[in-house]
Amino acid sequence: SRYGGFRMRKMMKKAIALSLIATMSMSAATVVHAEDEVTLRVLNWGNTDEEKIANDAIARFNEENPNVKVEQTCVPVESWSDFIQKWITMCTSGEAPDVISLGLEAVNMAVSNDLLVPLDDIIAGDEELTAKKDQYAPSLLEGFSSGDSLYGLPNGTQTMVVYYNKHMFDDAGLEYPQDGWTWDQFRETAEKLTKDGVYGFCFPCTYFQLTPWWSTNNAALVGEDGETPTVNSEGIVEAVDFLNGMYKDGICPEPISSDGYTMFANNQVAMVGAGRWVLNTWQDAGLTNDDFDCVQWPVKEKDGSVY
């Protein structure tokens, strides 16, 4: 969430659950007294259901803070770049939002362009916010920090895991995968599940689908400075070769045009990587907990995943 001046930030503290907390530096000089009427512009993104959830939260906030008017703009975008472009347009036209919901991958860009204000003093001066901050894993907060300053609190996480079809494993006589399995074990399992027009795995060529592979191989697209490209590093090349090998061997469908989530729901793919965002889609398709489960991403050099 973004706040205007110091006292406005204090009044908005209970709206933190709306979104990532991120304060526009261009508004930081404005001081608003608690009894003044205030309008806060909120920029959010998502579908109609997500917009309704945010509006419900805003309504609850307004009940406790009748002098604060919250105006939400919810952008139904198809891509993250569309949302960022909307934000840039609002900023350059003098209509920058006070509160914004940002993905973790946008934080460095926003901080480096001096668009956000640190939240450390706000959180330290409020017991409720301090308690909320302490609920998060330190590794998660690192993504919303720069140097010694914290610029946001997440309203949710999307941890990449491998979902697998229980029935396909049962039919193939395979044990369900366990956390800590390796790339080699993953490929061997996917190969055994590939038969009769069914693929063992599907990896759509998207950032979130590919990142866990080089992350578990101790690699990244950029260096620790966040600027130096490392896309040709050994770890990334090895990850891409690993996936390309599975595609060439017929273990995975064509990655550009394949809809792995739909194929998984239709029993055409035994395993697929995703976050929790796909669960509603599968629920609507009739899948239940009896049909599938999830496991941590397979490991090459480094345990963990991406969120």
Task: Annotate each predicted stretch with a short phrase.
Residues 65-76, 95, 173-178, 226-228, ...:
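A local structural motif
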Residues 189-192, 226-255, 296-297:
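Glycine-centered hinge/linker elements that transmit conformational signals in sensory
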Residues 104-159, 293-296:
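Hinge/lid segment of periplasmic solute-binding proteins
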Residues 33-41, 63-68, 145-149, 170, ...:
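Immediate post-signal peptide segment of exported/extracytoplasmic ligand-binding proteins
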